Design a protein with these regions (language model features):
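NAD(P)-dependent dehydrogenases' Rossmann-like dinucleotide-binding region
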Residues: 48, 179-197, 212-227, 267-272
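Flexible glycine/proline-enriched surface loops and loop-helix/loop-strand junctions
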Residues: 152-154, 198-201, 234-243
């Protein structure tokens, strides 16, 4: 068996998504001394970097962060400063066009309604994709990405820090080992205080800040006048941009129950 593993070979063989982005091959020259050859690192472009994307990028710092893209440069200022050598963009399409040959993978943590288009275009370019939850804005988009993954053969992963945390596995093991007895009822809730829920669409129009490209944030969504209530978090409460509290938090609070109890699709859903 050959002990040589180039970056190209690594990319062709990997199927572990973003987890693969942090793998350090043992056979890299000097690996025993903690050295990793520059040619063996992945070049990563971050899209949607001010919020959750900032945390994801910090976990990828063993690789090369070569490009950063966000529609709100004021909100992303701390990340631009953290990676001063990375090229900066407002528009992910411009980034793909200008430096698509300079990166191997993307990290996408934009507003929900733009996940599918950003990820699909990256996959069509042969780029590996790590996309934050919710994977897409609709089931239809998710099915399209699934087919595209099979077609392109790139490594993909949906990011969900809640399901990746140690606590979920611990609770699952308790249940699987019978340590708390038979589970017959589960209650889950969220008040999601980081953004107020049930907001009405604002009627007032505000001046768009110079550091924000509102048209680029809207992307495929229907145009609406800018109001500062939407940024940087509250867009989640409008279907044009987000998926509401259910799409934002259910994957965190319900996932442990679904995994531990091996639940299937719901048979009944009630809303009020």
């Amino acid at each position: 068996m050959s002990k040589k593993l180039s970056r190209a070979d690594f990319l062709k063989s990997t199927a572990a998504g973003a987890a693969a982005m942090t793998i350090v091959p043992n056979n890299v020259m000097g690996a025993a001394f903690g050295h990793k050859a520059p040619s063996d690192k992945l070049n990563i472009a971050g899209i949607g970097i001010g919020g959750r994307g900032a945390s994801v990028l910090k976990d990828l710092e063993k690789e090369n962060i070569v490009a950063l893209c966000d529609t709100d440069w004021a909100y992303s200022k701390h990340i631009f400063e953290r990676y001063p050598k990375a090229k900066r963009f407002y528009d992910w399409r411009e980034m793909y066009d200008k430096i698509g040959s300079e990166f191997d993978a993307i990290m996408c943590a934009t507003a929900d309604h733009t996940h599918a288009i950003i990820a699909s275009e990256a996959m069509n370019l042969g780029k590996h994709v790590y996309c934050e939850k919710p994977l897409t804005h609709s089931v239809y988009e998710s099915r399209l990405l699934t087919k595209l993954t099979e077609k392109t053969g790139v490594a993909t992963q949906m990011g969900n820090q809640g399901s990746s945390a140690e606590g979920v596995e611990t609770v699952c093991n308790w249940i699987w080992n019978g340590e708390i007895g038979e589970v017959t009822h589960v209650e889950a809730f969220t008040d999601r205080p980081i953004w107020p829920q049930g907001l009405m669409t604002p009627k007032e129009t505000h001046v768009v800040p110079d550091t924000l490209k509102w048209d680029l944030f809207l992307g495929p969504a229907k145009f609406r006048p800018y109001n500062n209530v939407y940024q940087p978090w509250n867009w989640r409460g409008w279907w044009d941009f987000g998926t509401g509290a259910l799409g934002d938090m259910a994957c965190h609070v319900l996932h442990p129950a679904f995994k531990a109890l091996n639940l299937g699709y719901p048979t009944k859903v009630q809303g009020s």
